[in-house]
Amino acid sequence: MQESQETHMSSHLDEVIAAVSVTSKNRLSNKLLQTALFQPPREKLHLCEERAKSYSSIREYKQAIQELVRCVALTKICYGDSHWKLAEAYVNLAQGYLQLKGLSLQAKQHAEKAKEILANSMESPYYNKTDIFKCSLELFYTLGKALVSLQKFKEAWENLIKAERLSKEMLQCGNIIKEEWIEIQSRIKLSFAQLYQGQKRSKEAFPYYQKALEYTETTKDEKSFECAQVLREMAGVEQALALHDASIGHFSQAHLIILSKEPSPEDAADSALSIARAAVASGMHDHHDVAEKYFQESMTYLKDSEGTEKAKFLSIQDEFCSFLQTIGQKERAAMILRESLEAKIGVFGDFSPEVAETYRILGRADLAQGNNNGAHMKLKKCVQIETFLYGSQDKKTMATQQTIDTLSKISETPVKSKQSLKAKTAFCTSVPQYVTPGKARHSAAE
C-alpha cells in the first residue's frame, strides 16, 4: 500500500514538473526543475534571475517578465520590504515591461515604486553605497526611458540628466569601470536621441544617435540586434533630414543584421519594407530600382502566408502599386490591383475599406484609359461600400458620388446627340422627293 502511495506521489510530482515547464530554446531539464522546487528562497531567486536574463537574451520578453515578477516576490521574502535589492528587482521588472510595446505606464509605476524603496534604503548605514548608486543609476535611466515612451519629455529629460551625471561621478570615483560606463552611456544616449526625435527635433537627435551607435558597437557585437535597432532609428532621422543616401545605407546595414538572426517572415518583411520606403521618400529617379527591389523582397517573405500576415502582404502590395503610379507605371499597378481584388475580399470582406479603395483606384484607372463604362461600374461598387461603412454624408462617399454623377453626365451627352441626329435623319427621309418634269426617277439599283 505504501509503495502504491509513493508511486502515486511520484507520478503526481512528475505532472507538476511538466505543468511548470516552459517550452523555449533554452528550457531547463525536468531534473533541474524538480531540484528547484525544493531550493531555499535565495537559490530560487538566483535561478529566476538567470532565467529572466536568458529569456531576454533570446527576446522572449513575456516569459522574462514572468520570471522578473517571481524575482520581486522572492526578493521580498529574502530581504524584506525596505532593502535596496527590492528596489533593484522593481527596476528590473520595469525594464522588462519596457521591452514590450504599450506597457510603458506599468514600467513607470514599477520604477516609481523602486524610487520609494530606494529612498528608505539610503538611510541605512549597513548597505554598500556603491550598490545603491548603481541601483539609482538604473532607476533614473529606466524612469527616463519610460517617460520618453509616455511623451512626458520634460520629466524624462530630468531623469536622464541625473543618470548621465551619476554615471560620470561613479566613473571618476572608481565605482564603475570604463567598460561599464560605455555600456550605460550607449543606453542613455539612445534615450536622449529618442527624446529629441519624439519632439520632431531631428537635428538635435542625430548626434545622440551617432554616439549611441558608436558606444553600442564598442560594447556589443557590430551585428547585434542592439546595433540594428540604433541603425534603423538613425536612418529614420536621416530620412527626416533629407540625408537619403545615408538613410538607405543604414536601413540596408540593419537589414543584413536582421537577416543573419533568422527572423520571422514578418520581421524580415518589415526590414525590407523600411528600405523601400526610404528609397521612395528620396523622390530620386536613381532610387526607383532600389524601391522596387525591396518592395518585391518584402512581399516575397509574406507571399504564401495566411491570416494577419496575408493582410500585411496585401497592404504592402497596395503601397507598391501606389509607388508604381507615382513613377508612371499606372497600367502595371492597375493589373496588380485587379489580381489582388479576390484575395482582399477573402481577407478583409466584401464591405471593407481595403476593397473600396481598390475599386476606387481601378475606377480611376479605367477613367484615365477612356473606359467610362468600366469606371462607372467600379466607382458604383466603391460608393456602395463607402455608404455602408461611413454613411452617405461622409466626405469620402460624397467625393466618389460626385465623380459618378459627373461621369453619368458625360455618358448622357453622346446619347442625346445620337438621338438628335436620328430625329434629323428621320425628318429628311420623310420630305417628298419632287421629280423634274421630263426626267424619270432613278431607281436605287441605278
UniProtKB/Swiss-Prot annotation:
Subcellular localization(s) per the UniProt record: Cell projection, Cilium
Keyword Repeat among record annotations: yes
SMART domains: TPR
GO cellular component: cilium
UniProt KW keywords: Cell projection, Repeat, TPR repeat
Source organism, top-level taxon: Eukaryota
Keyword Transferase attached: no
Each TPR repeat, start to end: 45-78, 137-170, 186-219, 356-389
GO terms (BP aspect): positive regulation of smoothened signaling pathway
Subunit structure, interactors included: Associated with the EvC complex composed of EFCAB7, IQCE, EVC2 and EVC.
Protein name: Tetratricopeptide repeat protein 23
